[in-house]
Design a protein with these regions (language model features):
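Flexible, acidic/Gly-rich N-terminal and inter-domain linker regions that tether
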Residues: 2-6, 10-123
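Short beta->alpha linker loops
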Residues: 132, 207-208, 277
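Short, electropositive alpha-helical surface patch
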Residues: 185-193, 225, 276-296, 352-360
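Flexible glycine/acidic-rich beta-alpha junction loops that bind and position SAM and/or redox cofactors
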Residues: 234-242, 273-277, 297-319, 340-357
Length: 360
């Protein structure tokens, strides 16, 4: 029997017909499909050993903590997850009778399909402009590579390629800070103006400046993301190094201004989980942002081999991810924030996170 997600799964995430929801698994006979609990388990491990025959075109990240690492997107039961590809994992992705199956301890954990990447992630043209950064955040690999800065022609070439494939639905830009935040905003604004002709939603995740929100809005940006990284001030000072004059308070002020410019449900911010913060700190941080109109994205820490010895971090457990995501879901509901309305970047992708309103 072939599993067809589009036909077998309702819009509300509940399977129909013979597909019934158990407390821990989606099952059809002995076949298991992903739900929130399984996705949390996959995210907690974060890595998978992939059978070589399935490695047709793995993705390599150029942004954030995962920069330089190969990964693969897997989809099942209406859920999507992104996993780092490495032989050093208790999970193994194999092909069985035409299906893609993830095994744990040689037992089937979940089955589904490999989700093809459009540009950086499925269903989005997600482009890293500057693969360089003047800052030295200890959780991020980008400063270790100091890669290239894409020209406008290179960006347009990527977008045109996606357009010709028929998959151009949204465009998202992210960027390191190659020289100064102000110079980066100048570059992003120019690139956004150049892609307006495609008439698709545009999201931008950058480091803010005093006037970045208004400039990005005027250029044609739909949604914006400024990452706080952590709401624990002591951790922020320890891991977000080299940000002289650019404090956590500055980012929070910038987020407040972004909501003024873009409106509720159009602004988001990453909170990294696994840097040593308490659950109570996460709760207070999520609520602080939600009161502003900002949607918090809880991002499990990727412990990069390129930062070995520079940071103490622990990948969150499945139980912790579920607990914090359910808490976030309830807080967002309290402040009338709707993840499902997001059109660009991480919230609709869901690959790296357990996402409230979509996964839970």
């Amino acid at each position: 029997m072939t599993y067809n997600e589009d036909k077998k799964q309702g819009d509300d995430g509940e399977h129909t017909g013979r597909y019934q929801r158990s407390t821990t698994r989606w099952r059809n006979d002995e076949m298991t499909y992903m739900n929130a609990e399984i996705k949390a388990e996959l995210l907690a491990l974060g890595k998978v050993d992939v059978e070589p025959s399935l490695l047709t075109r793995p993705s390599r990240s150029t942004a954030g903590p995962g920069a330089g690492l190969r990964s693969i997107f897997f989809k099942s039961g209406g859920h999507r997850v992104r996993l780092e590809i490495t032989p050093d994992s208790p999970l193994k992705m194999v092909e069985q009778n035409g299906a893609v199956v993830i095994l744990k301890d040689n037992q089937e954990l979940v089955r589904g399909v490999i989700d093809p990447v459009v540009a950086h992630c499925p269903e989005q043209t997600y482009i890293t402009i500057s693969e360089q950064c003047m800052y030295d955040c200890k959780f991020c690999s980008v400063p270790k590579f100091q890669g290239k800065i894409k020209t406008l022609d290179q960006v347009l070439e990527i977008v045109e390629k996606v357009k010709k494939s028929g998959n151009l639905k949204t465009i998202a830009f992210t960027s390191g800070v190659a020289t100064t935040p102000e110079n980066e905003i100048d570059r992003v604004v120019a690139y956004v103006q150049a892609v307006k002709k495609y008439n698709v939603p545009v999201g931008v995740a950058v480091y803010p400046t005093q006037d970045s929100s208004q400039r990005l809005k005027d250029a044609g940006v739909t949604e914006v993301k400024y990452n706080v990284e952590t709401m624990d001030r002591e951790i922020f000072e320890r891991v977000c190094t080299g940000r002289k004059g650019h404090s956590l308070d500055f980012i929070l002020t910038s987020l407040h201004d972004a909501v003024r410019v873009f409106g509720k449900n159009q602004v988001s911010s990453n909170i990294i989980i696994g840097l040593g913060e308490t659950d109570e700190c996460v709760r207070k941080g999520v609520e602080y942002l939600a009161k502003m109109g900002v949607i918090a994205v809880l991002r499990p820490i990727t412990i990069s081999p390129y930062r070995k010895g520079e940071i103490t971090a622990t990948r969150p457990s499945a139980e912790r991810l579920l607990k914090l995501t359910k808490m976030t879901r309830d807080i967002l509901k309290k402040y009338d924030l709707h993840v499902e309305d997001s059109q660009t970047m991480c919230l609709p992708c869901t690959g790296c996170d357990l996402t409230p309103g979509r996964d839970v």
